[in-house]
Amino acid sequence: MPVPQFDYLIIGQGLAGSILAFQLIARGQRVMVIDNDHKGSASQVAAGIINPITGHRLNLTDGFADYYSSASKLYQQLEQTLEVSLIRKIDQVRLLKNLGQASYFHKRLDQDDYVDFIETNKEASLFKNTEYGTAKIKQTSIVDTELLLQTFKKWLVDRNAYCNTFVDYSELGFAVDEVSYQDFSANRVIFCEGYQAINNPWLKDLPFKLAKGEILTIERQSNHESMMSWGNWLIPSTNDVAKLGSNYAWNDTDLQPSD
């Protein structure tokens, strides 16, 4: 029996597929990534926020320090490999929206686990109504997911490890310890399709719950350099541009901008 060309076929080159491919190739595995040039990809437009403090109660994510350490090392490896800057730290100024949230904030200030992550904000903010104050969230980071996908795709192409095509599931063939697609054969296939897995005949019955988020790219009217969050968020991107993000919609999940 002929040996398959690849160890893995990876369907989807979003953030998950890209990082998986990078890790497998670093371990000497033969990988082919198949993607339709990120059409409809959430990773392509994602803000890439790494946020240690979340929720109404300003909770520190369990295990954040370990997760962040691992993520930082990974993105540094990608930066060195791709020769681009992918991750940056940014202060986050969060609006305290009511008395209850302000109470949680003052409680967090007295907790040792939160010392490295939260403090009273002493700088000017863009918020007009700060009746309950603002908090500074430290160790927030932004990953440039669009740049990561673009440069990693080129890196794959240069290594003959990328195929730009729409996957027709009916053309996937399975045998013992082998999967084939068009002219490719591999030992395994891994689907990294994000929400598009709802159309995958082998995954469509899983209990997916789709959500639609939207991001506006807007002209900056301020030289404020911190991320602002108040349920929505505003991130300075360049000298002239900022990104404004919304909450999620659970019912309207098409790819069109909302009115």
Question: Where are the predicted features?
Answer:
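A short, basic/flexible loop-to-alpha-helix module at the beginning of a structural domain
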Residues: 1-5
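N-terminal Rossmann-like FAD-binding beta1-loop-alpha1 element of flavoenzymes
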Residues: 6-32
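Short beta-strand/turn micro-motifs composed of small residues
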Residues: 12, 35, 96
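Active-site substrate-recognition segment that forms the wall
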Residues: 19-27, 36, 49, 54, ...
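A short beta-to-alpha transition loop/helix N-cap that caps and shapes the active-site region
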Residues: 40-43
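Dinucleotide-binding Rossmann-like beta1-alpha1 core, especially the glycine-rich loop
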Residues: 49-127, 131
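Helix-loop-beta segment of a Rossmann-like dinucleotide-binding subdomain
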Residues: 56, 84-93, 119-155, 160-174, ...
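Predominantly flavin-linked oxidoreductase catalytic cores and closely associated redox partners
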Residues: 140-230, 251-253
